[in-house]
Amino acid sequence: MKVDPSEFELEFFEEIGFERKRCPECGEYFWGPPEAEVCNETPCVEYSFIGDPPASVKLDVWEAGEEFFRFFERHDHEVLDRYPVVARWRDDIHLTIASIACFQPWVTSGEVPPPANPLVINQPCIRLNDIDNVGRTGRHFTLFHMGGHHAFNNHPHDRRDIYWKEETVRLCYEFTVEKLGIPEEKIAFKESWWEGGGNAGPCFEVVVDGLELATLVFMQYEQVGGEYRELPQKIVDTGYGIERYAWITTGEPTAYDAVFGDLVDATARDLGVEIDGEAREILGELARVAGLMDVETESDLRVLRNRVARRLDLDVNELVRVAEPVEFVYGILDHARCLAFMLGDGVVPSNAGEGYLARLVIRRALRLLDGLDAEREYLLEVVERVLEDLRGTYPELAEREEYIQDALECEIDRYTRALKRGKKEVRKRLEEKGELSFEDLVELYDSHGIPPEVAREIAEDEGVEVEVPDDFYSRVAERHEGPEEVEEGLEELERIAVEEELPETELAFYDDEKRLEFKAEVIGTYEVNGDAWVVLDRTYFYPEGGGQEADRGTMRWKDGEAEVKDVQKVRGVVFHRIDGDVPPEGAEVECEVDGERRMRLTRNHTATHVILEAARRVLGDHVWQAGAHKSTDEARLDVTHHRRISDEELREIERLANEIVMKDLPVNKRFMDRNEAERRYGFELYQGGVVPGREIRVVEIEGWNVQACAGTHCDSTGEIGPIKIVGRERIQDGVERIRFAAGEAALERIWETEDLLRETCEVLRVNPENLPKTVKRFFEEWKEQRKRIERLERELVEAKLRAAPAEGRRVGDFTVTLVELEDVEVGSVAGTVEELVKEHENLVLVAKIVSNGSCQVVVGSGESAPPAGELMREIGKLIEGGGGGDERLAQGGGRNPDGLTEDRLVEIVEDLAGG
């Protein structure tokens, strides 16, 4: 978009004597002192601060953050604590990617007041779109601190004008120039334009000595149908790179040296990596030149290294020998810090969501360690050191070290096992396709945990070249940045609500959850796919939501009645699906909720909150709800956990849950201001998922658990009744499902178990206390009988095979025999076939083993017969499969057993013998 220059004209620039200029190198406009000639940003200039820092102070990353806080606190900004790096309050992204993300969507949309205005925050952020560049450009991080000072002007809940462009630029100038002592002639404010999330506005990029230190965004437009409209509220959205401020004030060769300090030397020493004066010179030069270009591909990296080698008069191979191990050290430290935050904030590595992204970072760190021939377990030591370094500023992370280390140990073990298993998968795919595409590499990584570099090495051993994109991990991360959209299947109801402009339904059940009978007025009736849906002005029927199934009941009026079969809420409008007569619009209806069903659902829902907290206390506070469903018979709770839940842990969870029931704790349900609720209870409020709105309904089990929840709940835990865990399963890597029942449903499950036990005892004619011993004895006897049967089957198969040479068909000089078998072990068959063809040089013996609609084939050829491998290739075509082997023995399989007959086998032998 072409921006009006007046958007950037400020009285402050005139006050300090800055002028608007056009950079002769890039053609972009910037504001700077009269003597400035270029915009001061790479690639128009090189980094000139490396080895020559322009600031009057020298700050590490923690000191830079403190100075940032103190400066803005003195300028009347309220300091906020950091938000988690996992964006629990949002359903569109997994990770916190910017400081403004902490206030989206509720504050920026105007729905919720800002927690402070103006405010300042030093927010740890994670972006993985440049993960492949971490370590080698000198400036890229997976986790970085974004210092943000934000002002929400004319906000619906705070109509003040806080400050806008003039004050924003003044504050940035004073912090950078006056506070940090960077000469004014070195700073430039480069004009730019920002767009994102449907909003847009002009912005300044703040640049010193080639390095962009901050971005000052003025969110003042919304994008509507390709047009820009003024927003009623205008938001100051700034992002200061705290790591970059540390780098520019220290002048270190790379940002990693500025951020990690002594950890770089300690880690390098442990890994046998030498960082001497030559190495630091090379690394500094690499960072300078990397700033002049986008290093996105392997060819870019080669260009970078060649340019630096020429400048330093070095052989490029020598440069790589010195620099690459240090780049690996930088990457390992960066990834360790990122993991300390991810795991410390409760992420459980898995194959989905934020857990997938954590696993991606872990496995890239392990690949870097592999590249240095280091023990993978060394990652644990690096993370331990990083946690100690973080302890002063983020003590909460160090407190979770036990979980962090345990999760990493699990992941290291999984990765090692995945590599062993994965090699077979790579070779299998190469046999099938003869190549590995990018999509193959992604699937091998996603489904089997095989890094693309390993897949390439295996393929090269098989003589197949594979191209691995240099930004592989970045591209994979982008695929998993946001949650997958779930199809709700309620589009037609949503269309009706919008087109009919239906008013929101009064949710009366929140006023009295015990009330089951009520009167209401019919707002409208609608037919959707043959079903009748009724909208009332008010309802006590709970609509499906939060994993809780909908209420059912009846609806009666003067001339008819109907059963309520389903209830759904769309855009605040509650639709009731009915079976029976259809009431007219405007009619008064008498409704009754099925009380028994409601009570069962209510008990199971409150029990879910109890079980979740019990799981957190037994397994650790990294446990997070990944899903839940509450029906009348049982409930299920999916929780994140890096290990399988043991029998002992499951029993302790059940014991704790029932202890809470017996304590009869009050269950408080109230609507609260979102900001107040978050301040009081933290983001664990959102265990059950994101809840929209300025006000959220908070369900608190006193002294036990607090969640934002819209479901129906008991008034005290005693109302739940007994809780019985009935099962557990691993539904995906990193997610455990706990199945349980509460109240009458729990008793029913206990009775079912007792009935099963009694019936079993009657069949076996034993008392319950003797059942385990009796079953064990029967099982041992069964195993012994099974062994005898298997031995007899093997003897029968061998006898059938050994009789084959005498029963075969003569084809010229050869004896051709097809033996058909069912459900036998291939290994024993192959051994017998191999023995027989050694004894009979003119024998062709083929065993077809049929099982579950497919078949496996063993081919044996005597010394004078056609080669077994060639026979197998032809047979593979008949059975719609494949296989291979050598001249004497071959094996294969296919999905069409009927394709191989003795006549077809004879034809194949004749063709090969004749050829």
Swiss-Prot record:
Source species of the chain: Methanopyrus kandleri (strain AV19 / DSM 6324 / JCM 9639 / NBRC 100938)
SMART domains per record: tRNA_SAD
Location, primary (coarse class): cytoplasm
One GO cellular component, as annotated: cytoplasm
Chain intervals for the UniProt region annotation (Disordered): 882-901
Protein name: Alanine--tRNA ligase
Protein's cellular compartments: Cytoplasm
PANTHER family: ALANINE--TRNA LIGASE, CYTOPLASMIC (PTHR11777:SF9), ALANYL-TRNA SYNTHETASE (PTHR11777)
GO BP terms: alanyl-tRNA aminoacylation
Pfam families, A to Z: tRNA-synt_2c, tRNA_SAD
Cofactor (UniProt): Zn(2+)
UniProt binding sites for Zn(2+): H605, H609, C709, H713
GO molecular function: alanine-tRNA ligase activity; aminoacyl-tRNA deacylase activity; ATP binding; tRNA binding; zinc ion binding
Source superkingdom: Archaea
Similarity annotation: Belongs to the class-II aminoacyl-tRNA synthetase family.
Catalytic activity: tRNA(Ala) + L-alanine + ATP = L-alanyl-tRNA(Ala) + AMP + diphosphate
Enzymatic class: ligase
NAD listed as a keyword: no
Keywords from the named record: Aminoacyl-tRNA synthetase, ATP-binding, Cytoplasm, Ligase, Metal-binding, Nucleotide-binding, Protein biosynthesis, RNA-binding, tRNA-binding, Zinc
UniProt EC number: 6.1.1.7
Cofactor-binding details, from the entry: Binds 1 zinc ion per subunit.
Role, per record: Catalyzes the attachment of alanine to tRNA(Ala) in a two-step reaction: alanine is first activated by ATP to form Ala-AMP and then transferred to the acceptor end of tRNA(Ala). Also edits incorrectly charged Ser-tRNA(Ala) and Gly-tRNA(Ala) via its editing domain.
Domain statement: Consists of three domains; the N-terminal catalytic domain, the editing domain and the C-terminal C-Ala domain. The editing domain removes incorrectly charged amino acids, while the C-Ala domain, along with tRNA(Ala), serves as a bridge to cooperatively bring together the editing and aminoacylation centers thus stimulating deacylation of misacylated tRNAs.
